[in-house]
Every structure is written in C-alpha cells, then in structure tokens.
Amino acid sequence: MEAALLLAKLPEAYSIFDPLVDVLPLIPLFFLLLAFVWQAAVGFK
C-alpha cells in the first residue's frame, strides 16, 4: 500500500520536469532532421 502511495506522489514530486518530459519524445525527430540536413550539406553522397 505504501508503494502505491509513493507512486501516486511521484508525478507531483517531479512536476518541475513536465516540460522536459514533453520535449523528450521529439528528440529522435531532431536527430532525423539533423541527419537529413547533414546529408543535404554533403550532397547526399
């Protein structure tokens, strides 16, 4: 029961990280975009 209460409090405890959690799923898209821009810069060799 204590573990359930602890898990219930975690989102409140880590609420300051909410903006970071919102951005994290976008990071792979940034890598994909970076790879495309890099290939465009070297002429798609």
UniProtKB/Swiss-Prot annotation:
Output one GO BP term.
photosynthesis
**Record's keyword terms, sorted:** Membrane, Photosynthesis, Photosystem II, Reaction center, Thylakoid, Transmembrane, Transmembrane helix
The protein's topology relative to the membrane is: Single-pass membrane protein
Cellular component GO terms held in the UniProt record: photosystem II reaction center; plasma membrane-derived thylakoid membrane
Note the pro-peptide positions: 1-8
Membrane-crossing residues? 24-44
The main place the protein resides is membrane
Subunit architecture: PSII is composed of 1 copy each of membrane proteins PsbA, PsbB, PsbC, PsbD, PsbE, PsbF, PsbH, PsbI, PsbJ, PsbK, PsbL, PsbM, PsbT, PsbX, PsbY, PsbZ, Psb30/Ycf12, peripheral proteins PsbO, CyanoQ (PsbQ), PsbU, PsbV and a large number of cofactors. It forms dimeric complexes.
Q: What does this protein do?
A: One of the components of the core complex of photosystem II (PSII). PSII is a light-driven water:plastoquinone oxidoreductase that uses light energy to abstract electrons from H(2)O, generating O(2) and a proton gradient subsequently used for ATP formation. It consists of a core antenna complex that captures photons, and an electron transfer chain that converts photonic excitation into a charge separation.
Q: What is this protein called?
A: Photosystem II reaction center protein K
Protein's gene: psbK
